[in-house]
């Protein structure tokens, strides 16, 4: 473990602080707030009225919406069961309305509303006036409300999203024939942005090629210096003014490494793109293992020195070059192959409506297994996920919306797709994480004309080195391949030997594209043998066919490819929903709740044991993991995943052997360690039988399997298994990844319940139902109607999604098995805290808490003291029952003998 991180943890524990007391920071409408009196981002998510149907006249300011449901955004219109594939979700119009009274302090300010994403086509009204009609689901909508607001009285914003199938805008494909799901609603954040009438523009609000907002790029980079170019687009909606543009670049420690001032005169109702440049000496460069981010402060002043606009952006100083057969060069140096996964944004039950912390945790979970590249599938990702990639050192392939569909009949479809290309580059051009621009729809037969325009528009929007577009190398795209910088393929393409290669999707292995049977697609609850097969398939898949060796794209194939192949992304990181198939995609290394399968540990074996000290929340530590449960149905072979040099396996106190985690015949840095034919269920039974009989015994010492991770001849870590015993209790874990939940009315925290034996081993083979309840400053999402609560254990786990309130404080979660009885497993409780939101919340009403289950005390007026005594008595009864059961076990042994 990194000494600095270890010391920090010790200090936090000594001073009684929570390890998770870290409130994550996210960008708002493309910037980070510095002085709210000048430019402010107000959280506009809380208190929207909603109805899941079309309603005539709902745009009117005086429309009666009093019987509508009140929701907080992000909102996906509905909560869905865990399996929501095959068209389960609602498609059609819906309505959102927000009532608010603008603060008098906003008079004279520009007031913008910024929707990060509304699913489908949408219309937006302010006080009954239509201000925007939008076609597209994944790009922000930035609307000026200034001329429509009424101060001192109630205003109403009305939004009508419609996620119905529509061929006229991308993706264009009907959901019932689509390999992902649209879901719906205002599913990303909404911000109210206020600033003066002299301001830096938003790049999507102005139609300027390679302009709008702030544009940063780098040139002449060496370890000694780098040239930084900054374009700032300033609008003046007041009188003509003499202005000063101030730039200040600060490193992570807050040290100012460069500053610059430029004077400019802007006429009334005009704008100017101010071009500035400076040199940074001895720059700290951005890379996956050292993702140094600088803060670029932008301040606009008048000639008297009054601040008219101010904010900051995060930038990472880096250059990339793709040199075909030579591979990827980062900051002028050859960089190893990149390995990662694709990412759809949907989450169990809530669809696309993830709060920022869940997006961040998605990226963090993937980074913690060593991944350093993500392909956006198949649309631009939420800003919070993009922020996370910048911060965690993860490259990203940015993609426009599209999947196996081209509308030949309506020219507007291509026009809108080309607009998506421009908007994508304008939005994400400053991010150090951007590796490739996927400016074509995924797996689609597009015309050559489109290829020409899409690549041309990308170059116009990013006219500097480091811009790389990508398309498939398949033969039916051969006419278009020459226009792109990079090709998607398994390895070097014969017809384009000088082009760099990236593998966009690897691992999936279906029999046909109707049935979708595959060794790669494994629901976690199917158990250990299918999970082991999935992991080993992702490591290597080959077979003999007609006397020839066949190989499928795998980890082995990727690492064994030529240097032309500089990176690859697994299909897919998480299980996700689909429109055209009744089954979800089950090929993730984590399930839809982001809980790991065995293949998760295959990837984690590639995580280094040191060298990631600069990556937040990621500890490069030795680990070893036994992918075996020692059940009566477990396989004979024992597979162990590790990032150590060697693994020593001990069973029942006897050493089985020591094996290396490297293989001279494999190009993969770490291979699965397989101990062949070492587990026999009868041995496990006999060992477990002989050692049992003590009250409160956690496990039978003689029945333990232990793997020890060895580095440089020393044991540095270990992992033990034993046959899971009688299910005794539930155990809860707050899966917050060290990111403290925010009390913003939107944040969601995952709490996992495990059914365990006395020693804490998870009883994977169990089908109990678990009921969750929540007290304090949180609310349980879902209930009986959407199969969320109570919830059946899947592979020994049940998951609660807890939404925070708008008040910071304590949240208490309780889990109990649905059935009652003296021998029922004990309940579990856990508490966590939320912290205040980063931004001001603006709302006039809150959703009502939905409580489907209210525990009834034995006595209606039962006091807290009586309740405590009743619980203690119940625990004593259980302990007595434990003694009785042990005696019964001894009697049965005697009788059988």
Regions from the language model: what does each represent?
Residues 25-52, 67-103, 114-116, 158-239, ...:
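Non-catalytic, glycine-rich low-complexity segments
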Residues 26, 30-35, 54, 91-207, ...:
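Accessory beta-strand-rich segments of carbohydrate-active enzymes
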Residues 39-59, 78, 118, 178-185, ...:
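Substrate-binding clefts and catalytic carboxylate motifs of secreted carbohydrate-active enzymes
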Residues 75-115, 119-127, 132-135, 166, ...:
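Active-site-adjacent substrate/metal-binding segments within catalytic domains
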Residues 106-109, 149-154, 240, 280-293, ...:
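Short glycine/proline/serine/threonine-rich loop/turn segments at secondary-structure transition edges
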Residues 150-154, 231-323, 832:
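Extended acidic/polar, glycine-enriched regions
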Residues 230-233, 299-300, 638-642, 747-764, ...:
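Beta-strand-rich structural segments
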Residues 361-365, 373-601, 619-627:
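Substrate-binding/catalytic cleft of secreted carbohydrate-active enzymes
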